[in-house]
Swiss-Prot record:
Descriptive protein name: Protein PAR32
GO cellular component, as recorded: cytoplasm
Phosphoserine carried by residues: S36, S39, S47, S123, S138, S141, S147, S246
Composition bias, Basic residues: 217-227, 275-284
Region of interest (Disordered), ranges: 134-156, 217-295
Entry-linked Pfam families: DUF3602 (PF12223)
Additional remark text: Present with 1140 molecules/cell in log phase SD medium.
Modified residues (N-acetylalanine): A2
Listed Low complexity bias regions: 285-295
Keywords of this entry: Acetylation, Cytoplasm, Phosphoprotein
Disulfide bonds: none
Amino acid sequence: MATFNPQNEMENQARVQEYKVSTGRGGAGNIHKSMSKPSPVLLPLKSNSKTVANNNNNGSNQEKVPRFAIGRGGAGNIFHDPHLTRSAQQLDSNDNINYNDVINDIDDYISPITSDMVDEGGSNPVTNTRSRISATRSHQSLHATTSSPNNNAPIVVGRGGAGNIFFNKKKVASNGGNEEDEIRGGNIEDEDTINANEDNLFVVTSNGNALAAIKSTSKKPKNKLKGKSAPEKFAIGRGGAGNIISPKSSRNTINHNLNDDDEDKFNLKDDNGKEKKKKKKKKSGFFSSLKTMFN
């Protein structure tokens, strides 16, 4: 028969009531166990806390200064505030607090939900508050964007593969005879953005070196179909076959001439003629004559 042990029962209750509290971002040392649910900002007061004299009692009583954690990990996130003591935290209902001073001290202060924020139609006050906050943030971000000088629009591109190869716009004749813009492959918005910022494009090679993409001065490849010019390709991206630039950047460093192909063909014919002459010389030797005698 099992006997009742009050000590084991107390230990079981203590295990149930334990809380795991995290006071930072770094390492496992910021997780500790607590029997009570502590404040997320104020750490429990310990014996190693600094003491400060109470000015009201002429320094006769000593009060311990609470410690605070600002949540970045390590011992550097714990600091002492000698002005905020335990007695200072005990607020009575009759105390007059200037909340405007509190709001000004906090950068990301969000006002509580009050009666004037709730619409008469009975809309959700939380949604209403969020909409006001989002509207304020969007106004601030818009003001910051327009006020900053030389603010260039960013170019969002892919990370490699065939999807980051675009074609430049060209003029084609429509059925009515008017010229229209035609884009083959890619998105129209992306194409317009890239064409407007061609000077700011960068080519990222496989070894991670970034080279400025300069407009190519080489001749465009001829198209077999008359009246149609091949669109100018250029690729942007970080990996895969998409970081091979043609013809905008890769042809800047490679001087390709169409006459080189003709010279290569001529050299190939010359080499073939030399090989045939060598074979004839071998056949006209002494051993070749002996072979013909026995054959």
